[in-house]
C-alpha cells in the first residue's frame, strides 16, 4: 500500500470521528506568507515533498495564481497530524489575502471553525488583517496567531531578542484589540491569544521552522539557539529542531475546536431555524445519523466533472445518489459524485459524514451560500461580503456566433464567484461585469478567454457610483396611473452609525422578520423607537419603514411596495446609479379595494416616482467609491509616491518608517486609480510593494459632480443634462 493510499485510508477512518477533526483556515494580509505556510504544513503532513514546499505553492494551482504569485481561489485540502499519540484530521482552506478577492475569504469562513491568522513580523497588523479577523469573528470562527518572517527580524533588521519580544507583544496586542472589538460578547475574553498557553506561535514559513511556549517547554529548544542557526544560515538543522508543521498543527489541535464543540455555538447564530427541532438538534450535535444538511461555500468548474460544489456538512451524511433540496433556489437535485480535496486532486468517497468538508457534483443550480438538505428547512443566513462591486466593464463577443457561449461563460463565472455581478445593459445590449477592483476583473476575464476560448472586446473600466441625499424631504404624494392608489412618503438621510451597522451585518439586510428586535437595535443607534418599529425592509444600505396607521388593504400591496422601493434604490433619479443611505418612510396611503386596480402596473410607478421626487427635494448628491492604498517603498521614493497619490485626488493618511522601508497609507477615489500599477512601478523603478482595499464611499466634490453625472447619463444613452426637480416630480 503506497503512501497516498495509506493517507486516504487514514482520512476515511478519521472522518467518522468528529472529535478528531479540525476545520481550519489560514487568513492574512497579501504577501504575509499564507500560502507558503499552507504548503509547508502539507509537506510536514507528508502530502508534498519537503524540498518543493514553499517553492511549489501547491494550493496556488490555478496557472494565473502561480504567474501572479498571489492566491486567488480558496483551495482546500485534508491531511493527518499526530498530537500526543492520537491522529487528527485537519481540513485546511487557504484563502486569498488580496482585497479584490475578499469574497472567497467570506465564503471560506462559513466552512471552518478555527483560523490561523498570519501576521508578518516586519509589517505587523495591516488593514486586510483587520478585515479578515472581522469576517472570522462574525462567523463565530475562533482565531490563533502565527507571527511569520521572524528570520527577517534576525537577519535583516538585526534585532536583539528583547526588541523582538517587544515587537511580538505589539502584534499580539493589536490582534487582541481586534478580537475585543469584533468577537461575539461571550468570547471577547475567552478567545484572546496568549504566548503562555501556546495560542501564539512564531517562526518562518519560508525556512520551515516555528516555536511556541509549549513546544519549547516540551523539547528544551531555546530561542537563542534558533537565532544562532538563522544567522549561520543552517536551515536544515532549524527545520529538524523546530519543525513548522509540528508547532503550528499542535497549536491547531490544542486550541481550535472540533466540529462537535463548534457547532454547539455556531449553529444558533448561523442558522435561522428552530434549534429545538430534530434537524436543529442534529446540527447542534454534529450527528452523522441525522438528516443531511450542508452549506455550499464554493463552486469550482472542473473540465471533466463539470460543476463541483464544495461545502461544510453540518448534519447527516452526504451520499452519492441522494435526493436533496436546494433551499434558496427552491429546486430539487440529486447528488452524483461525493469526495474530498487533497489540493487540486479530488478523491472520491462513498459517503462523507457531518463535521467534514465535502466536494460533490450534481448540484447544478447551487450557488455559493446555498443550503442543501434532505428535506425543506430554513436556510442559513446570507453570507456577508465585506466589499461591494465598484468597477464595471462592458463585454462584447467579437464574433456574433460566440454570443450564446459568452452568456453561459458569464453565468458560470458569476456562479463560481457571487461577488461578481453580471447584467445586460438593455440600452446597448452589452454585458456588464462588475467586480471589486481592477485586478479582480482582470483575473476573471483572463479565465473567461482561456477556459472558453472566446474572443471578447472589453471596454475601459467604469466606476460604479452611488446616489444619496443630504436632508429630509417634505411629504410627497405618489399616485398610481389610474389615480385609485395614493402613497404619502418622506425620505431622510440615514445616519452613519446605522449605515455602518448594516454594512457590518449587525443589522441584517433583507425583509425584516423580527421588527421589534431590529427596532431596538435602531433605537440604540439613535433612531426614534416609535418610527423604527415600522421597519419592513433593508436593501443595499437603504431602509423602508411603514409608519401608517390602520390603512385598509395595505398589507395586500406591501410586497409590490417593497419591489417598487427596490427598483427606486437600484436606479436613483440623478444618473440611474444605485442609491445608498436613504430611509424611505411611508406615512399614509389609500389603496383601492379591488385588486384588479392595484396590480404591479399601478403600484410600481406610484411608489418609485414618489421616492425619486422626494429625493430630488432632499438635495441629492453623488458618492464615489474610495480605495485604501498601502505602499511599501525604499525611503528615497517617498516624494515620487506622494506626488503620484496627490495627482489622483488622493490623501496621505499615515506614514511609518521601519529601517530603510517606508509604509505609506493613503486613500484615493477608485476612478482615479486605474493604471496606478504601471505608474507606481515606473515611479519607483519597480521597487514598490502595494495593495489596496475598499474604503467605502465618499461624497463627490460639487465642482466634479455635475460633470460626472453628465458623463454617466451620456454613457447610458440618457439626456446628458442632469435632471431638475420638475423633470422628476410629476405634475398632479
From Swiss-Prot:
Protein name: Elongation factor 2
Domain tr-type G: 19-260
Pfam family, one: EFG_III
Any one of the GO CC terms: cytosol
Modified residues (Diphthamide): 597
Keywords: Cytoplasm, Elongation factor, GTP-binding, Nucleotide-binding, Protein biosynthesis
Keyword Signal applies: no
An example Gene Ontology molecular-function term: GTP binding
Amino acid at each position: 500500500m503506497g503512501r497516498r493510499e495509506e493517507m486516504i485510508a487514514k482520512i476515511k477512518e478519521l472522518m467518522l470521528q468528529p472529535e478528531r477533526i479540525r476545520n481550519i483556515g489560514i487568513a492574512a494580509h497579501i504577501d504575509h506568507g499564507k500560502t507558503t505556510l499552507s504548503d509547508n504544513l502539507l509537506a510536514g503532513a507528508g502530502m508534498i515533498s519537503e524540498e518543493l514546499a514553499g517553492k511549489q505553492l501547491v494550493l496556488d494551482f490555478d496557472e494565473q495564481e502561480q504567474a501572479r504569485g498571489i492566491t486567488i481561489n480558496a483551495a482546500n485540502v485534508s491531511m493527518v497530524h499526530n498530537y500526543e499519540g492520537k491522529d487528527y484530521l485537519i481540513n485546511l482552506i487557504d484563502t486569498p489575502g488580496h482585497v479584490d478577492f475578499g469574497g472567497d475569504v467570506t465564503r471560506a469562513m462559513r466552512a471552518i471553525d478555527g483560523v490561523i491568522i498570519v501576521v508578518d513580523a516586519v509589517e505587523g497588523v495591516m488593514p486586510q488583517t483587520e478585515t479578515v479577523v472581522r469576517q472570522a469573528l462574525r462567523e463565530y470562527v475562533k482565531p490563533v496567531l502565527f507571527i511569520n518572517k521572524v528570520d527577517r527580524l534576525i537577519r535583516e533588521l538585526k534585532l536583539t531578542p528583547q526588541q523582538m519580544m517587544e515587537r511580538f507583544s505589539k502584534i499580539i496586542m493589536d490582534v487582541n484589540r481586534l478580537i475585543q472589538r469584533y468577537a461575539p460578547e461571550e468570547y471577547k475574553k475567552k478567545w484572546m491569544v496568549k504566548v503562555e498557553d501556546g495560542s501564539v506561535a512564531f517562526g518562518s514559513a519560508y525556512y520551515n521552522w516555528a516555536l511556541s511556549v509549549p513546544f519549547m517547554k516540551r523539547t528544551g529548544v531555546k530561542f537563542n539557539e534558533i537565532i544562532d542557526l538563522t544567522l549561520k544560515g543552517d536551515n536544515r538543522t532549524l527545520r529538524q529542531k523546530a519543525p513548522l508543521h509540528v508547532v503550528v498543527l499542535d497549536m491547531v489541535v490544542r486550541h481550535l475546536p472540533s466540529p462537535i464543540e463548534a457547532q454547539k455555538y455556531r449553529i444558533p447564530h448561523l442558522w435561522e431555524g428552530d434549534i429545538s427541532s430534530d434537524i436543529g438538534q442534529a446540527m447542534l450535535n454534529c450527528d452523522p445519523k441525522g438528516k443531511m444538511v450542508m452549506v455550499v461555500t464554493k463552486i469550482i468548474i472542473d473540465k471533466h466533472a463539470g460543476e463541483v460544489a464544495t461545502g461544510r456538512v453540518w448534519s447527516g451524511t452526504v451520499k452519492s445518489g441522494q435526493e436533496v433540496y436546494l433551499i434558496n433556489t427552491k429546486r430539487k437535485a440529486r447528488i452524483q459524485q461525493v469526495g474530498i480535496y487533497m489540493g487540486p486532486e479530488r478523491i472520491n468517497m462513498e459517503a462523507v459524514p457531518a463535521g467534514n468538508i465535502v466536494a460533490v457534483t450534481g448540484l447544478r443550480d447551487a450557488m455559493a451560500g446555498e443550503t442543501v438538505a434532505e428535506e425543506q428547512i430554513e436556510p442559513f443566513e446570507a453570507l456577508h461580503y465585506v466589499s461591494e462591486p465598484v468597477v464595471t466593464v462592458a463585454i462584447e463577443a467579437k464574433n456574433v456566433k460566440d454570443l450564446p457561449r459568452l452568456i453561459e461563460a458569464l453565468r458560470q463565472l458569476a456562479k463560481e464567484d457571487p461577488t461578481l455581478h453580471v447584467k445586460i445593459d438593455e440600452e446597448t445590449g452589452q454585458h456588464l461585469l462588475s467586480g471589486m477592483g481592477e485586478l479582480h476583473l482582470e483575473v476573471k476575464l483572463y479565465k473567461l478567454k482561456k477556459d472558453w476560448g472566446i474572443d471578447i472586446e472589453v471596454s475601459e473600466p467604469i466606476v460604479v457610483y452611488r446616489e444619496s441625499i443630504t436632508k429630509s424631504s417634505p411629504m410627497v404624494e405618489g399616485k398610481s396611473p389610474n389615480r385609485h392608489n395614493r402613497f404619502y412618503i418622506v425620505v431622510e438621510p440615514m445616519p452613519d452609525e446605522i449605515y455602518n451597522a448594516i454594512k457590518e451585518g449587525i443589522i441584517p439586510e433583507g425583509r425584516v422578520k423580527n421588527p421589534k428586535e431590529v427596532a431596538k437595535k435602531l433605537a440604540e443607534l439613535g433612531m426614534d423607537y416609535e418610527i423604527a418599529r415600522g421597519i419592513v425592509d433593508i436593501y443595499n444600505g437603504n431602509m423602508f419603514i411603514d409608519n401608517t396607521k390602520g390603512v385598509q388593504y395595505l398589507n395586500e400591496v406591501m410586497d409590490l411596495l417593497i419591489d417598487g422601493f427596490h427598483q427606486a434604490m437600484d436606479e436613483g433619479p440623478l444618473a440611474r446609479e444605485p442609491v445608498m443611505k436613504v430611509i424611505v418612510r411611508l406615512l399614509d396611503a389609500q389603496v383601492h379595494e379591488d385588486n384588479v386596480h392595484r396590480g404591479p402596473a399601478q403600484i410600481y410607478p406610484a411608489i418609485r416616482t414618489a421616492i425619486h421626487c422626494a429625493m430630488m427635494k432632499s438635495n441629492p448628491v453623488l458618492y464615489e467609491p474610495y480605495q485604501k492604498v498601502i505602499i511599501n517603498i525604499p525611503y528615497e521614493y517617498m516624494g515620487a509616491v506622494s506626488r503620484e497619490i496627490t495627482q489622483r485626488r488622493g490623501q496621505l493618511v499615515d506614514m511609518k518608517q521601519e529601517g530603510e522601508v517606508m509604509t505609506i497609507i493613503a486613500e484615493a477615489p477608485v476612478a482615479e486609480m486605474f493604471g496606478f500599477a504601471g505608474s507606481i512601478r515606473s515611479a519607483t523603478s519597480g521597487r514598490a510593494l502595494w495593495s489596496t482595499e475598499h474604503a467605502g464611499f465618499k461624497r463627490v466634490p460639487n465642482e466634479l459632480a455635475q460633470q460626472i453625472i453628465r458623463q454617466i447619463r451620456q454613457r447610458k444613452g440618457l439626456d446628458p443634462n442632469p435632471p431638475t426637480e420638475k423633470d422628476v416630480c410629476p405634475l398632479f
